[in-house]
Amino acid sequence: MKTNSIICGNSIEEIKNIDSESVHLILSDIPYGISLDTWDILHNNTNSSLLGTSPAQKKSSVFKKRGKPLNGWSEADKNMPIEYYNWCSTWAEEWLRVLKPGASCFVFAGRRFSHRCICAMEDAGFIFKDMIAWEKDAAAHRAQNVKVVFERRGDNENATKWKGWKLGNLRPLFEPILWFMKPYPIGGTLTDNIRLHSVGGYNEEYFKNNPLNNSGIEVCSNIIKCKTSQDDRGLHPAQKPVALMEFLINLTTVEGQVILDPFCGCGSTLVAAQNLNREYIGIELNPEYCKIISERLEEKTKA
């Protein structure tokens, strides 16, 4: 397949057209399966209400779009993690096939189901190398006030008893980046693999000199701080900072190598690859996002 290209289509099918062992790095912000939008609903449960609901949520169009809650706990909620595992299994083997031996694969995954992604990729043949924590500078946080709920019900006794308590999660100020590696030939070493395939290590010198390396924390920490700039907002609901993608690309590849993003959204991975003189292949299902990607890459070329 031609590099420096954007394929508008179904990733699970289109990746079959990529040559085996032709990619040096896969870097992708895959759907998290948490019903962020219609493209992120990867389960058959249309009445998911794991954390309960409120009258305001019932009226909200976003909850209707997500197939979200109508009544308390649903038995179908229990199937969502395994359904996410099954979805990851539909593409994991193809990812393994197209990567060079010893090549890295970085996957942005949601905290709730990341373990299912790990299992699917291990079952496909990947080695789970590490989990990097991306520490964000800000994150939306919605937690229902228990006291207010009881007050609306006219239950003042429990409203007083549970003052200060919330429903929901803590503020999500980190996101997991799962680091996988394609196994290298048995009997050899990673150093042998670097000589043969030019992948398998990480660039410590780059890491030490990069501003994302945490001051005050041991060099080459697996906690990465990266702020989201204004340029990294507004194109996609799950948009990631270009600087973060550049960091991961520089960490594991050299100029001229091929970067693949099978779920490229608004194209931040491809923009980062272009900035760093890497070849790239991006696959995206939504034609509107494919247009945005083309415009971003063209704008960078003109600049």
Residues covered by each model-derived region:
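Core catalytic lobe of class I
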Residues: 2-302
